[in-house]
Structures are given as structure tokens and as C-alpha cells.
């Protein structure tokens, strides 16, 4: 039956009739035209409204609860009166993260209700644990449920980041530059250099990636190499890539170790996508708490409070992102109105895992194309020429509880290869990793590793082993090595002891092995800094050569304000050296770190080596580049100098800016228009970044959501009023460069004394500027905020006459006293006051 609009007259009758809903008249007083439903007298006007149909709110109510203060709205219901029978036409549920959830059975019953009638008590039974109760007096519908009918509000393990916020063409260019110079003992030298460029140009979620390098710039042996040229679209949980790819862009799920060096021209498609974010920081086993009313949940471990969280009525999964990793029990305590309602023990299962995390759907990728294999050689014994081949394969990965796995199957050069990777945590103390490869030319490989934390938590142990045998087709070398190591935290046994670490590596293919042993102990930590002791020994043996043993001992002193100093001795190559090192760090400025080291032989035969060696370095962070300058004189007499620098350039339309940061291949250009060295700050997802001058570029990681807020800098004397563009919400894909153009006014608090042209003071005068007004005192003195872009003050008098003060604020910052200033255009203040007029703007 269609819903008709109420006429004004009908609305008045309806409002009048509603009075009768709250008064139960006796039978003699009842209107003969009224109708009784569920013990409530329904006036004729309201009955007509019910026949037309109306929408009422739907609330969930826990059976046994007193009152409705903890009820939650979960939707609405459309009710109507059909031949004296009140019915529900349909129910519309409203999803909300904060609402209680109903079980799937109850949800299905609600969604399938169609023209269901209420009984005489205005109730519709749904299941043994849920029913609908209608209150005509309050005009609301309650879903009354027992605890068994409640579902559980689980936390989402995945989320799509959505559409890009940048709808125009934009680009990010990252650059990395390096220069190396080696000065030989005989006076000769050689220099090499490189420039690596990575460009990502994007239109919304579509982007093209170009990655290459130039070598030997400025020399006669200049060369260039293009490593990647591909189109990619990663959106809504699926990714497509095509072009010249590397193995990581071809697939990133399973191991792929049997591919030799070369170039791949192909395509890749799958659901291994960065546009869908999987949260692996929650416990694999959800921690669930039931609250009969709104209250708190406390998580406690070994008597220590780990978390306090607030929930509404219902079954809720507790947020475990902030809890420590591991497998352990926590006590879950539910508190309502200050009373402990329930207390139970549940297990937290949080382990570091590869891939998407527990509960994620099966990940897959299919890929293939043309493979240009480079020439290959193994120690000059086996060589293979460059060759063209086809390439096709598929990858997949998944998890089951804490067990995770990945597999890759592919073929090229008429060979079939299968590879797997398995990860299995055993309890909270042992982790097992296995990686295997098998090829049709009888090649095989096995890599196994086990790590364990021993009881007591003061020691750990790890074991690795790799065995590889290659047939007559794959371009890869045999391998046979094993390693074992461990760490013993003696501090757990006695607070005055330190940490001891040992490792042993044996490469049986090359008949080489080495072991290391290191000890570190904190000697002092207090107000004046910290002092630590380091000592260790290494022993190497390569093939049939004699063993080489090195030893060292050092004291490390860390002082406040970023100072660090180390002194010690090392013994290697048959002689002992004394070593000194120092480092200073700076929080601000272009130079962020400077350091130096000096070594001198004090005993033993140095042979051809020099007795004195050392070096110095500096790390810089400039506006357009950051990097390191290092100069080192080694014991062999060579002097090595190298400079590395990197940065990024962002572009969108007419906006282009550069940065010394390389945080990602997306970013934001801030066009603030600040003059000279003006500075404000950008707060991005809680982190503070300084913005200097008119334009800044800030690279950011792609596939991310960002909340950007502009604010005054605590390191600047200037004060700014950010009129518009203060807050922005951005979603960035690779190559997306957003532009934020806020309206920023640089404010200066100006104080002074204003006079007319004849020197008389403008006492008690209303003066104005671009952004506000104020009144001078009886001495003509004033204080007001002025926008530096409009450094004028004006005074209006005699109707439409104006005088003006031009302020010199170019060098002003924060607050300034300008002294006596003249309002040009006003000959005398006395002439204004004699007229007795009220002056105002």
C-alpha cells in the first residue's frame, strides 16, 4: 500500500489524537470511532495514519535489562494497519561499528519479515532467544534478545583504501647520486660515479614506472641501464602490471630462486594488492568480551594492566593491536557501573608472520611473458650464452591459524620449477621455516631454519642449513652451508652482567668456516650519560689458507646532546691497534651528524701497512638533497673519498617542488606562499614535518591514507593565521602528488603611537586594518594584529575621508614596537574632535 502524505488538517487531528495514547479512558468515555490495539485506544486520526503506514525506530534490548538507557538503535521498521491487524511490512538494518550485533539466524529472520502480524501483546516471536516488541505509547520497536541471540562485533582484518584523492596527472622523481674516488699509494687515482633515477607518473590509480641508472658520468666510460618500464594498476584488491618487469614486480608471493639475471617483458595479474590493507597486528585467536550494558574491559597479564577499552552492550572483540607479541594468557575483566561483572582467562596469539596475516583470503598471481637471459658464468668453469625464452607461472600463499605457506610454479627455457615456503610457530618459543625448490633438470634446493627462545626468556638459539644441487640447465650454483648461533642474556641472572652472543658458520662447498663471539655490558647509565663495554673475537678460515683471528675490546661513552665517544683496541693481521671514535648529532640545521675515527698500531709487525689510519664523515640533510660525505685513509695507504646524495621531485600541473627526503613515490606539494624563511608545520598522521618558504614537497609512502593538518611551528617566532586549507584528507597511490594551497596570513602584533600630520595624538580613535580593528587609548597608543601582506592602518573620519599609516614590517617577526607613526591624510586630530563626530570604519 503506498504511503500518502499527511494533509495539514490530518496532522492536526493526529497530534490531538496522540494525547489519547497516554491516557487509558474507561469504556464509557471511549470514542465510538476509536479502535483498541494491544490495550491502547487508537483515535481515528492515528488509525488512519497507521493504515497509510509509518516508519518507527528499531532498538536492540537485552532481555532482563532494566530501562532503555543501554538500548542501541540498529535500524527502522515500516508498520501498517491492515483490516484491524497491525503488521510489519519490512525492516531496514543500519550497520555501525559501535552497535551490538545479532546472530546470523536472528538477522535472517529480521530480513525475511514481510507483512508479519503482531499478536495481541504486540509481539512477533523470531527465535527461541529473540522477539520483536512494539510500544505504541512510545512509537518504537524493540528487538528483545537473550545473550545467545547476540552476534560478535569482530574487528576488520582488511580494508580497501578507496579511490585516489588526486584526479589529475602528477609525477614523483626520486634520484640517488654517488661519486667515489680512490687515491693510490703510488699517486694514481680512479674515480667513478652513478646517478639512479626512479620516476612514477600517475593518473588517479593508474601509473607508469621508469627505473634506470647512468654510470661513469663525465668519464670516457659512460654507460646507462634501464631496469624497469611498466604500467601498473593496483585497485580494490587486485593488481595488474605489464611491461619490462623485475622478478618482484612479476610476483611477490612465493619464492622464485631459480630465475637467472636478465630482463622480463610480461604481464602479471592477481589479488596480491597493496590497495587492500590487512591488519596482522590483532591476535589470531580473537579475545571476546560480553557486556550486559555499556562498560569497560580490562586486560591484565601477570598482575600488570595491559589495556582498558570501552564498549557498548553486546559481544565485542577486544582490540589487541597494542599488546605484546607472543602466545600468552590474559585475564579479561568486564566492569559495568564500577562493578566487576565477569572475569575469565583467554589466550592471546600474536606472532610475527609473513604475508597478509591470519584469516586473510587465499592470495594468488598469474604471470608470464618473454625472458631475455643474460650470459652466465660460474667461476669461469661453466658458462652459458645469452638466450631468449618464454616464461609463465603462478604463485599463491595462505595461512591456517598460525601456519603460513607460499608456493610458486613456473617454467622457462623448457624447464619446470616448483618452489614452496612453509612457516610454522610451535607454541610461543619455537619457529620453523622451510623453503624448497625442485626442477625438471633434477635441480633441488632445501633451506631450513629453526629459532627458539629457551625457558626463562634469557636466551635464544637459531640454526640454519642450506643444500642446493643444480642440474645441467638452471643457471645457478650449488650450495652447502650451515650456521648456528645464540644469545645469552646474563643480565637476567645477575644485574651486573651483560649479553653474550656466539655464532658459527660452515661453508662446506668452499671449505671455509668462521665463528664469532661478542660480549656487551652496560657499565653505567645515569644523568651524565651511559658507558658500555664491548669485547669480541672472530676467527676465519678460507680453504687451505691459515686461520685469521681478530680480537677487540672497547668502551663506548654516550653523552647528552647527541655526543658519543669510543676507545678500544683490536688485534688482527699480527699486530695490535688502539682505536678512537667520536660522533656528534644535531637536531637542526643542514649538518645532522659529524664523526671521526683514528687508529694507530701500538705493537706487532705491521708489514706494508701504515701505522696510522683514520677518517671523518658528515651526514647532511639539505632542502633538496640528503646524504653522506666520507673521507677515509686505510691501513693499506689508500685514501677513499665518497659522496652520496638523494632526494625527490614532485610535480602536478604548474606546481613543482623538490625535497631531500625519499620516503616514498607519492607525496604532497605545500604551496604556502610564505616569504623568506617563514616556517609552519604539517602534522601528517601524528608526525610533525617542518615547512619552510613558499613551496615544499613532502614524499610519502603510496597506498596510504593521510590526515594532514597545517599549524604554527613551535620553532618559529612568526605567527600565522591559516584561514583555509588547514585540514585535508588524502588517499595516495604511486605517483600521486597532491597540492595543498592554504590561505596563510603572517601575523605581526604591532604596537605604537599614532599621530596626525601636525603631531597631535589620535586619542580614543577607532583604527582599522585588513583583518580587524581596535581603539587607541587617551595617549594615542594601540596594539593590533597586522597581516604582513597588508601592512597598513587606516582611520576614517568626516564621512568618507580617510588617513592611512604605512608600516615597515619586512623584518618584523612576532611582535614589534613601531613607535610614533603618522596617519597621512589627517592634518590635525583637533579638527576631528572639535566637530564632535563619532569616528568609525
Swiss-Prot record:
Disulfide pairings: none
Extent of the signal sequence: 1-29
Stored InterPro entries: CarboxyPept-like_regulatory (IPR008969), Pilus_assem_C (IPR031917), Pilus_assem_E-set-like_dom (IPR032636)
Keyword Membrane: no
UniProt keyword rRNA-binding, yes or no: no
Inducing stimuli: Negatively regulated by H-NS. Positively regulated by IHF and EcpR.
Record Pfam families: CooC_C, TcfC
Effect of deleting the gene: Mutants do not express ECP and are defective in biofilm formation.
UniProt keyword terms in alphabetical order: Fimbrium biogenesis, Signal, Transport
Family the entry assigns: Belongs to the EcpC/MatD family.
Function field: Part of the ecpRABCDE operon, which encodes the E.coli common pilus (ECP). ECP is found in both commensal and pathogenic strains and plays a dual role in early-stage biofilm development and host cell recognition.
Name of the protein this chain belongs to: Probable outer membrane usher protein EcpC
Gene name in the database record: ecpC
